[in-house]
């Protein structure tokens, strides 16, 4: 399993970004339609189901981290490692589904948990199998499969159900679950050929029980870190849902979703570079991570300024006056979102490449505690704006702490992490910009 070169990474990043952009565009269109059809309360139910389903993603993150570490750092057989990972995924899916069904327990006010429970095992498998595509350098293939199902394809299906069929919320949610089922089934095709032959003996991973035990030990810490990260990222949503009206939850989640549109670039870079960071030597992986972090934050600053200026106006004109309060909330969220866009890259290096999932777990626990305490302290007197301020404070703190630990673990100077460099611009684009500037100077003379 070889890492792609710089041109290959750029190609994969652009491909990932294009598919994410397609998915985001379709998701925004579907979101507008569902918000207008079902109002803030219905929008809140749909958003909350998606947020609850993220627990499947965090569980899969632990499995993915363990697989990437065993294949990338320990050089184990990919086939043997994945075979053990499937057993771990089955156990996690069973536990997660049962837990969500127990929380729902037939309560009509908790239907979000029912829909999330139905999609949970398929989502977990889909997220976990993504690491096979990353390590086997088949990112474009899984991008297309995801875009056609849980990405743009699923959103377009929801859009059609709402605008053409005028389907009720329950039918829309069933269709939402069905897209995860389809995506999980489709993603399994071709994996056997990608994995290659299985190895034998300790050098290739050892007995399945030994591989599984090591995965459980490593993956449990990585999954716990990912879960705590998610809770730190979304504890404000749970508190808003518990303390304020459903309509307020719908407004708040819309502000969050609007801000997270900026994360398309960072998600594309993280997804396409994960296999490379896992398999490169430590120094090269650290240099790549630092370059991506400083480049992403620089891009997000520009995007954040534009979204702060246009976001509130777009929300009112696209979603309706009932969601106008989301505009000021969005502006309060943006500073933290700009910095938090690099969190995934920093966390991946600390947990997977440096092999310190326990350290990451500790950092995320601190972030969760800070965000929860600040949200509880501010939501009473300031409402949604208090929750947004608490969220931003937690994001900024998390970024500063993780940058510090990344610098220590990798030996990278802070300047190389924080300050963009001319070399960060792709060579072809840099040469074109240089030629354009020279042409302008010549014309002025």
What are the functions of these language-model segments?
Residues 113-117, 145-196, 366-370, 384-408:
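Hydrophobic alpha-helical transmembrane segments
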Residues 40-43, 102-116, 309-341, 385:
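Interfacial segments at transmembrane-helix termini and the short loops linking adjacent helices
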């Amino acid at each position: 399993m070889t890492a792609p070169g710089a041109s290959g990474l750029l190609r994969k990043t652009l491909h990932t970004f294009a598919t994410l952009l397609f998915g985001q565009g379709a998701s925004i269109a579907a979101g507008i339609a569902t918000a207008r059809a079902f109002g803030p309360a219905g929008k809140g139910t749909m958003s909350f189901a998606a947020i609850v389903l993220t627990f499947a993603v965090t569980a899969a993150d632990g499995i993915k981290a363990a697989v990437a570490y065993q294949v990338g750092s320990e050089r184990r057989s990919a086939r043997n490692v994945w075979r053990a990972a499937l057993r771990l995924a089955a156990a996690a899916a069973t536990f997660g589904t049962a837990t969500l069904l127990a929380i729902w327990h037939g309560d009509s006010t908790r239907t979000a948990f029912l829909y999330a429970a139905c999609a949970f095992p398929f989502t977990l498998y889909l997220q976990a199998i993504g690491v096979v595509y990353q390590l086997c350098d088949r990112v474009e293939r899984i991008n297309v499969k995801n875009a056609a199902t849980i990405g743009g394809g699923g959103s377009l299906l929801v859009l059609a159900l709402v605008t053409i069929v005028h389907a009720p919320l329950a039918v829309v949610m069933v269709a939402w679950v069905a897209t995860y089922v389809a995506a999980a089934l489709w993603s399994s095709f071709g994996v056997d050929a990608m994995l290659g032959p299985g190895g034998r003996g300790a050098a290739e991973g050892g007995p399945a029980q030994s591989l599984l035990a090591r995965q459980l030990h490593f993956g449990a810490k990585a999954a716990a870190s990912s879960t705590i990260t998610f809770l730190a990222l979304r504890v404000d949503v749970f508190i808003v849902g518990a303390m304020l009206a459903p309509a307020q939850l719908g407004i708040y989640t819309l502000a969050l979703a609007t801000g997270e549109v900026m994360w398309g670039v960072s998600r594309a870079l993280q997804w396409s570079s994960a296999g490379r960071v896992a398999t490169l030597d430590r120094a090269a992986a650290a240099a790549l991570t630092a370059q991506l972090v400083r480049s992403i934050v620089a891009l997000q600053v520009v995007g954040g300024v534009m979204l702060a200026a246009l976001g509130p106006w777009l929300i009112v004109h696209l979603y309706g006056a009932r969601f106008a309060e989301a505009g000021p909330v969005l502006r309060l969220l943006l500073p933290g979102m700009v910095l938090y866009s690099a969190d995934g890259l920093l966390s991946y290096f600390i947990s997977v490449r440096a092999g310190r999932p326990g350290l990451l777990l500790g950092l995320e626990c601190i972030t969760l505690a800070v965000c929860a305490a600040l949200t509880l302290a501010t939501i009473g007197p300031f409402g949604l704006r208090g929750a947004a301020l608490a969220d931003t404070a937690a994001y900024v703190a998390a970024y500063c702490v993780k940058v510090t630990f990344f610098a220590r673990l990798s030996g990278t100077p802070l300047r190389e992490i924080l300050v963009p460099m001319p070399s960060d611009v792709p060579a072809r684009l840099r040469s074109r910009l240089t030629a354009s500037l020279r042409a302008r100077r010549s014309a002025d003379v």
